[in-house]
Design a protein with these regions (language model features):
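Active-site-proximal or metal-binding-adjacent scaffold patches in catalytic folds
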Residues: 1-190, 199-238
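Walker B catalytic acidic pair
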Residues: 195
Length: 238
């Protein structure tokens, strides 16, 4: 069950869940505000809580508004695309064979069948990014499992509109945003550690922060670096 409350010019979506504490989040790219509240919490208490966070909400929304956006993809020759933080110029090749993506020097060669439209080109490139992300993530999981004393049961990779990653701590699964394959490797490693830390502490509380401080002392540097990079043009914070 959910409702929407107004805080002056700001609207917040409230979702009632079987939880003990209230949580408030601001999501990119538009600064959408979402509040997760205990099932029986009074709406006036929720409003008071949200009002107490107004200054922080506005600060986060301002950061998101100032964050650079990638231009919409048109899949044209010499269009810029990124892989692990490096810029490549796109080259479209039409050939009557299985679609593929290849990196050569500073060029990304996207091979598609003759007549392929933009949707098909995007599908081929998205599938390639997913595969690159999986290949890079599995070694990181293997590295951090013994260091953190946790076990990741399954890894999922898909396009996510509001998060870099998520964790199902009960099932032991983590999910990563395909967009991470466009960012520097150290940013991916930070998100992997962040999500694996949720296997030890599922809330964003002081204990969770202490875990990040312990396992990755420079985590705030990597978080800030990631959130300062251009985000995808579509509607999609750590």
């Amino acid at each position: 069950m959910g409702i929407q409350i107004e805080l002056g010019e700001i609207k917040a979506d409230v979702v009632f869940k079987d939880i003990k504490n209230i949580h408030l989040s601001v999501y990119p790219p538009s600064g959408m505000v979402k509040i997760s509240a205990p099932l029986r919490m009074d709406i006036d208490k929720i409003r008071i809580f949200a009002i107490s966070k107004l200054t922080w909400i506005k600060q986060q929304q301002k950061k998101l508004q100032e964050q650079e956006r990638e231009t919409p993809r048109e899949y044209l020759d010499r269009e810029s695309h990124y892989v692990w933080g490096r810029r490549y110029l796109l080259k479209i090749k039409e050939a009557d064979k299985a679609p593929s993506v290849e990196l050569k020097h500073k060029t990304m060669i996207l091979s598609v069948r003759p007549g392929a439209d933009d949707k098909k080109k995007q599908e081929v490139l998205d599938a390639w990014y997913r595969e690159q992300l999986k290949k890079a993530t599995y070694p990181l999981i293997e590295k951090w499992e013994p260091l953190m004393g946790v076990k990741v049961e399954r890894l999922f990779v898909r396009r996510m509109k509001t998060k870099w990653g998520s964790c199902n701590h009960r099932a032991g699964n983590i999910m990563l945003n395909t967009e991470l394959a466009k960012k520097p490797h150290e940013c991916l490693e930070y998100i992997v550690v962040h999500e694996m830390a949720h296997l030890l502490e599922h809330k964003h509380n002081a204990h969770f922060i202490s875990l990040l401080d312990k396992f990755m002392p420079k985590w705030q540097f990597y978080r800030d670096k990631l959130n300062q990079l251009p985000v995808s043009h579509e509607n999609w914070n750590y």
